[in-house]
Amino acid sequence: MMKKRIQFFFGSIALLGMSACSNSYVKPDAPIKEVPFTQVHLNDNFWTPRIETNRTVSIPSAFKECEKNGRFDNFAIAGGLMKGEHRGDFSFDDTDPYKIIEGASYSLAVKYDKALDAYLDSVITLIAAAQEPDGYLTTCVTNKCYRLSGWWGKSRWEKINSHELYNSGHLYEAAVAHYRATGKRSLLDVAIKNADLVCQVFGPGEGQKHVPSGHPIVEMALAKLYKVTGDGKYLKMAKYFVEETGRGTDGHRLSEYSQDHKPILQQDEIVGHAVRAGYLYSGVADVAALTQDTAY
């Protein structure tokens, strides 16, 4: 009996990592459906206090670090709301606020917090202001931070490993989580506008860029965006990035470090950077489930 209780308990914990679904999907999900973690309630003496500490201490602390280290200022500068020099050492610093918004949204889905909800609104206002008219959103590029040109080059989408699509992926993840938790479209609309641009720039067509994502996550994020919006082009784009992996169509080829050493259907061993691998293969699983493509 004890063994069964332990198995059930850890199974319940595992569900917390799955998508929040406060709002219904527009499209039917894959044949295998996750249980929304909002349907799992913990009332124990171990996890419950830690989840509360996450809400009251960890999330506010993480946002304060963003304030202190200029993460929000970079969006404000890009949006013309303030003057100043771009701060930070990496082209993917924009993802720090996105990741925290995602986590904070999961927290809101479990326990509503009026102050946190309002704070997210203020941060999202900065992010929306930084988005360029055509949907582009990577602050170090918009702010022309050539100090970081080793990452991104001199213009948009110049380098496959620029992390621009990585930034987009985390934006979509945050936007979907926020929409599901609050029903607000403020960040979702930013994500959709960016994703529409990505679908124009990348793909198999003439004049498009025929490259993989460089640093995976946009694959699984596009799959989530598809499930929320019902727009099939996002799933198609996710599948394109998965299948362009390892092909080197435009002469771009990364290494095993980026799981770009061979086409995805030829890969039979997990190699390279663990985070990249986790994101890529999760995206492959999402695409396989949603398309029911048995080749995967």
What residue spans do the PLM features occupy?
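Glycan-recognition and catalytic cores of secretory/periplasmic carbohydrate-active enzymes
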Residues: 25-296
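C-terminal motif of bacterial Sec signal peptides marking the signal peptidase cleavage site
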Residues: 19-20
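Hydrophobic helical h-region of N-terminal Sec-dependent signal peptides
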Residues: 11-15
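Bacterial N-terminal signal peptides that target proteins for export
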Residues: 2-10
